[in-house]
Amino acid sequence: MRYVVFRLTHELKKRTGWFEKQFPIQPIHQDYISLEAWRHAQIPFFLQAMPARPYASLPVKTIDPPACLEGRIKFFNAVDKALGLDYDWLTHPLTGYRYSNKVHWSKVNDFSAEAGDIKYVWEKSRFAYLYEVIRYDAQHDTDHSEWIFNEILSWINANPVNAGPNYKCSQEMSLRLLNWTFALQYYKNSEHLTPELFSTIQYAMYWQAKHVFDNIHFSRIAVRNNHAITETLALYIIGSLYPQFPQAATWKSKGKRWFEAEIAYQVYEDGTFLQFSMNYHRVVVQLLTWAIAIADGLGELFQEVVYDRAYKSLQFLYAAQNDETGWLPNYGSNDGALFFPLNGCDFNDFRPQLNALHVMLTGHALYENGPWVEDAWWFRASLNGRKAMAPLERKMGWQVFTKGGYAILRDAETISFIRCGSHKDRPAQADNLHLDVWIGEQNVLHDAGSYQYNTTPDLVKYFMGTSSHNTVMLGHHDQMLKGSRFIWYH
């Protein structure tokens, strides 16, 4: 009932213009903190801590000049797109459709066949590609801060507050805020970060964070997945790191409480995840790592359930992981999301992210030394005085995760992974009894993946339906009745 009432109210606000009043386009510019004051503030960000060893000592290959410096961006961690150095942040790279930056975000149609999948416009605007440049600068002792700040300024100039496609999704804004924060901290003392530029950036950051807070119940009630975890965490972090922002204390306190509630609800007692997706579960692992690193810097603790579900998540994901490659079954929805690419490993290699969180919780590496230790280095991962959890050990034989509905059988050479359970929360795919089999490093029986969300009905039916899974079908019938978009009825 709460969901129905919220959706009806949300639609009414959209149709009556309420959102246009609540979220005004390009409000009057204000300064909340000066660059000098910000630089001298004792901001508890993990990058401020001196590394235990220099970047050069990490077992990382020589990093080539990032392709983004030439205008090439990797989309969904799979396909390079030559957007050019003067990309306008509004044009769909496949369809050529250009969104207006004068239309209020509530009027933007994000499911338009003419425009194409809006995620293609959102992808660069996440600013995850900045990590390529930051890693390059760390290894080569170079400074591309001017280029990075020009990218941020270009985005701000092209995207008036609360207008256009890049203000449509609060999760996208949250990721942008975290990635800008990381870059600002890394290049904090750059001569290219001028008072005028900092004023422009902090104005855009404030209004994006305010948007996330004022619309937080859309993700917490209508969506209730990794979006809600991302957004509530962003509120906690922005409220903590920018206390001069109006409402910062409220963002921090409510963001923390909501984040704890989302982790407790979305990560089940056995460490499985309500989205039934390995890749989205990795998204949560990265967000948990951010959360614990920031809280440690603040000298704060989350409710015990956060650390427990973080540890249980590692237990589940590690149980399904191939030791030779670091890959997991490509099970569930996978749109190529990797919010914070802080290493040079393959996208499908989960070792960097699992290791960073494992070090944070146990004080020990999960794997032998290799390029996958880089994430832990960036997060300055350590126990920081917290009680150590037991380091994970490889287990053979059966492991059953009843709440999520998975069974995993391992021996020295093979892994069998089967989905077998009921759904407490809405499923993304009709895939009960799906079987994944690994022999050595080869995934000989595997999931087909999920492709795109906004595509033709037949492709949606195939990738979300039973046909693309190793399981039983009666004729051409899916196991469940399909509803609209991501919905399965029964």
Predicted regions and their residues:
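Membrane-proximal basic amphipathic "stem/tether" segments
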Residues: M1-H40
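Low-complexity, Ser/Thr/Pro/Gly-enriched N-terminal "stalk/linker" regions
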Residues: A67-K107
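Pocket-edge structural micro-motifs
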Residues: T91-P93, Y131, R410-D411, R419-C420, ...
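Aromatic-lined, polymer-binding surfaces characteristic
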Residues: N101-A310
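Short alpha-helix boundary/capping segments
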Residues: W122, K168, M173, D425, ...
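Carbohydrate-active enzyme catalytic cores, enriched for enzymes
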Residues: T272-Q275, N279-V444
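Active-site rim segments in enzyme catalytic domains, especially the processed small/beta chain
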Residues: D431-H490
